[in-house]
């Protein structure tokens, strides 16, 4: 294995408590607007299924998108694998059920008019087969004519090898910095993210390692189509990587 592979060998896609604790603050400082992102999804759904009444947000994270979704749909639910992220979501939207589960094999036993998988969560799947498991499971939980929305990670031709970026957030009594460095290895991007948190009790830092698959547009589309979801790719918004929007046959 290469040095990069050795570093990432034990990487988990489940967010740690340290990461969950500062997630909203640092990504808000980076320009994320969850209400606006959710609003864009609502508009896309409205043009395809104006009568939609229920929505499931898989890999819902801290529940930031659910705050907007709950104002738009009669029935809203979330799904999250990380205990730390799920606990924040439960506090944020206590009236919304937040289920624990893996996006590849969860079973809620009921259909939804809309299912969203945002924040490039599908790219944490290591293989195309796992990506297809995700889309098949989404299709199983979609009502006929229901709408699926997936936000991808970068396509292989758009990824910048060696990309670095940074941000600083001032949040209450805390100052949080984030530095990241991403490299290409095979069909994946491997990102090292270093955080420093300064707070009244002192300064602490920690490092996260993230592996994200560089699936192609065709691979996402085929995974959706083969699951029985007619899909189209809409480039650009909300975060530069676009969205896949599909309707279940």
Swiss-Prot record:
GO BP term, pick one: methylation
Enzyme Commission number(s): 2.1.1.324
Record-listed substrate binding positions: 30, 165, 178-182, 241
Ligand binding (S-adenosyl-L-methionine): 59, 80, 102-103
A GO term, aspect molecular function: metal ion binding
Pfam families xrefs: Methyltransf_25
Catalytic activities: dTDP-4-amino-2,3,4,6-tetradeoxy-alpha-D-erythro-hexopyranose + 2 S-adenosyl-L-methionine = dTDP-alpha-D-forosamine + 2 S-adenosyl-L-homocysteine + 2 H(+)
Cofactor(s) of this protein: Mg(2+)
Keywords: Magnesium, Metal-binding, Methyltransferase, S-adenosyl-L-methionine, Transferase
Similarity section: Belongs to the methyltransferase TylM1/DesVI family.
PANTHER family documented for this protein: METHYLTRANSFERASE (PTHR42912), N6-ADENOSINE-METHYLTRANSFERASE TMT1A (PTHR42912:SF93)
Reported function: Involved in the biosynthesis of forosamine ((4-dimethylamino)-2,3,4,6-tetradeoxy-alpha-D-threo-hexopyranose), a highly deoxygenated sugar component of several bioactive natural products such as the insecticidal spinosyns A and D.
Subunit-level organization: Homodimer.
Protein name: dTDP-4-amino-2,3,4,6-tetradeoxy-D-glucose N,N-dimethyltransferase
Natural source organism: Saccharopolyspora spinosa
Gene designation per UniProt: spnS
